[in-house]
Regions:
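Active-site-proximal helix/loop segments of hydrolytic enzymes
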Residues: 1-109
Length: 109
């Protein structure tokens, strides 16, 4: 593969947390650029500019020989966001935003 995107739903003890969050492998500059582009597209979709892509040590990203990210689509622990994530139209728009982020990454090299 040329890129790896692992898609998840998030859950957190603070039920007020919401919004998509993108993670990348610490120290991987290309994955950071990839994550930043997806996070920007997701932030535009949900109307939130507070989230920045976050680094960490993630097994799936460590194993990938190509730029890789983890996309947490939202927090199931937030009842309002859970309701949105259960809506097929919302999920389609969310996935289209991820695709926009991929295009931003691919065409901004």
């Amino acid at each position: 593969p040329d890129l790896v995107i692992s898609v998840h739903m998030n859950k957190f003890s603070d039920a007020n947390r919401r919004g998509p969050q993108v993670f990348f492998q610490r120290g991987d500059k290309e994955s950071k650029r990839f994550a930043d582009n997806i996070q920007t597209a997701l932030n535009a979709f949900v109307g939130n500019d507070k989230h920045a892509a976050l680094s960490g040590d993630f097994f799936i990203c460590q194993c990938a020989p190509v730029p890789s990210v983890i996309v947490e689509c939202g927090f199931l622990s937030n009842k309002e966001e859970e309701r949105l994530l259960l809506n097929a139209d919302y999920r389609e728009q969310l996935s289209e935003s991820i695709v926009r982020g991929v295009f931003l990454y691919l065409y901004s090299k």
